[in-house]
Amino acid sequence: MDAQLEWASSLVPKRQLQQQQQQEQQQQQQDFHKDQLMTVGMRIRQRVDQGYASRTPSTSDASLQPGVIRDYSSVIVPQFTRSPLPTANSLPPMLINQRTMSTEASSLEKWDVAEPAAEHETMVNGSKRRL
C-alpha cells in the first residue's frame, strides 16, 4: 500500500500539491470568515444582553448623565477632532435663495382655475372635426 502511495505521489508534481494545499487553506479561511460573519448579529445581541444583565442601578443612572460619555475618537482615529454641533437656537439654512427661486413657479391657485374646454376644429382628410 505504501508503495502505491509513493508511486501516486511521484506522479503529481510538488507544485500542484502545494497549490492544492494553499487553495484548501484559503477555502477553510473563507469558510471560517463566513461563519464569523453569519453569527455577528447573534454575538452583538449576546453582548448587549450581557451588558444589561451586569449593569447595576448606579451605573444605569450614571449612563443617563451627559458627563459620563467619553470621547475615544482620538484613540481610534489619530488627529480626529469632533466638530461641535450647532445650537438649537439657530435656524436651519434655507434650501432655496433668491437666485434659485423662480417667480413664475406653479402654485395651487393656478391649478384650481378651471380652463375652458379646448374647442377647436381640426382638418382630417379634408373634413372638419370638432373636438
Swiss-Prot record:
Keyword Ribonucleoprotein in annotation: no
Gene: DIF1
Ranges of biased composition (kind: Basic and acidic residues): 107-122
Keywords for this protein: Cytoplasm, Nucleus, Phosphoprotein
Primary localisation category: cytoplasm
Biased composition (Low complexity): 16-30
Biological process, per Gene Ontology: protein localization
Role, per record: Mediates the nuclear localization of RNR2 and RNR4, 2 subunits of the ribonucleotide reductase.
Family assignment from sequence similarity: Belongs to the DIF1/spd1 family.
Region described as Disordered: spans on this chain: 1-37, 107-131
Known partners and oligomeric status: Interacts with RNR2 and RNR4.
Protein name per UniProt: Damage-regulated import facilitator 1
Entry GO CC: cytoplasm; nucleus
InterPro entries documented for this protein: RNR_inhibitor
Localization: Cytoplasm; Nucleus
Post-translational modification: Phosphorylated by DUN1 in response to DNA damage which leads to its degradation.
GO terms for MF: ribonucleoside-diphosphate reductase inhibitor activity
